[in-house]
Amino acid sequence: MNNPLLAIQSQYWAVRDYLSPVLRESKFKEHGRITPEEFVAAGDFLTFKFPVWQWEKGESSRARDFLPPDKQYLVTRNVPCLRRATAVDYTNADEDAEKLLSFLDDAEEAPGPDDDWVATHINRSPPHRPTDMDEIPDIPDSPTTAPTREMAGLNVSSGGKLEEDEIPDIDDIPDMDEEGLEDLEDDAAVRIVHPSEAEVNSTAGKNLLQVRTYDCIISYDKHYQTPRFWLFGYDEHKNPLTPAQVFQDVPADHAFKTMTMESFPHSGAQLASVHPCKHASVMKKFIDRMEAAQGPAPTAEPETISSTSGTSGSAGGKEEKEKKKKWGLGSMVRKVTGGSVPKVEKDKDEVVTGVPVDFYLVIFLKFIASIVPTIEVDSTTSTAL
């Protein structure tokens, strides 16, 4: 990964990000871009609803002045990665391996085109099948249930009653040390066999699931004016993953293209990052689809206007005459600028329609989950959007 071209490109992006102006006007609905204040608001909503995400301040020398000192970026740790990307690759051979599934009962009406689910990879066999496991043999029953000769020779009813003199006293039993007896050590019972390192390594990966974990980070990109996603991975022994190992968990369509190794601006470490050049356009499409699914926005109710007009209409004739005669400077300014009390009250009661900006990072995580499907990034599936 020591490519000089990538190093030059990273330096160019760092300078470009430094010289880019900070977005001050919200472009959330128009272009899918957000301001640093909106990024903090969306991060507060994410940490409140899903506490696995936490704010981090990072290194003080690398802090961004347009963000609060204690809210520089978001992080969630120990996110599991159960499979490699090759286990979920979708190739051309899998295009025909699809099937529509319907979960409606027979008593319900016929399903529509939107009521079916698509099941993919239906012809792909799993790597480990339960039927491939060897069966545990049952313990065979004893061939005979007859008592042994020793047990057959015993007769409980035959023996007389023991007398008290025949019971030995425990103090009369001689000690082993007094008799000169020595304990015999059984070599077979105390022998400990240590397996070799090769045997341990060969059996470690047979029946155990090798789980990798990742630290997922969301920062704010000043140039693209969108969030940016970062990954730092560990193996099953909590050792940091190499860049080659990280890209084993990234689909081939995105490895070294959409996702590359970049310098994390808050620490300088080399982390895998999803390039944010397309984030704004993709988020704009998601927001438009969600708002279209919610239906048309409700019209404003003219209660304030009607109540105001009713109040003004109920005034006496004397007050109306005084208002007509009264043409002061304040009245002229309010009349020209349109500033009046009913309009101010209407702005306060204005209902915000559509998707709020607080949901931005929740939608963003669902978009990232489609890029790295092997990593359990999205923990917000129970949220009703």
Swiss-Prot record:
Region feature Handle region, mapped onto this chain: 281-359
Localisation: Cytoplasm
Composition bias, Low complexity: 303-312
Pfam families referenced in this protein's UniProt entry, alphabetically: Autophagy_act_C
Region (Flexible region): 88-208
Principal localisation: cytoplasm
Superkingdom in the source lineage: Eukaryota
Any one GO cellular component localisation term in the record: phagophore assembly site
Keyword set includes Transport: yes
Enzyme active site: 277 (glycyl thioester intermediate)
Keyword Nucleotide-binding part of the UniProt annotation: no
Residue ranges of the region described as Disordered: 126-169, 292-329
Key words, A-Z: Autophagy, Cytoplasm, Protein transport, Transport, Ubl conjugation pathway
Any GO molecular function: Atg8-family conjugating enzyme activity
Record-level GO BP terms: autophagosome assembly; autophagy of mitochondrion; glycophagy; nucleophagy; protein transport
InterPro entries from the UniProt entry: Atg3/Atg10
Family: Belongs to the ATG3 family.
Domain text: The N-terminal region is involved in phosphatidylethanolamine-binding and is required for ATG8-PE conjugation.
Complex and partners: Monomer. Interacts with ATG8 through an intermediate thioester bond through the C-terminal Gly of ATG8. Also interacts with the 40 amino acid C-terminal region of the E1-like ATG7 enzyme. Also interacts with the ATG12-ATG5 conjugate.
Function: E2 conjugating enzyme required for the cytoplasm to vacuole transport (Cvt) and autophagy. Required for selective autophagic degradation of the nucleus (nucleophagy) as well as for mitophagy which contributes to regulate mitochondrial quantity and quality by eliminating the mitochondria to a basal level to fulfill cellular energy requirements and preventing excess ROS production. Responsible for the E2-like covalent binding of phosphatidylethanolamine to the C-terminal Gly of ATG8.
Protein name: Autophagy-related protein 3
Species name: Cryptococcus neoformans var. neoformans serotype D (strain JEC21 / ATCC MYA-565)
Gene name of the record: ATG3
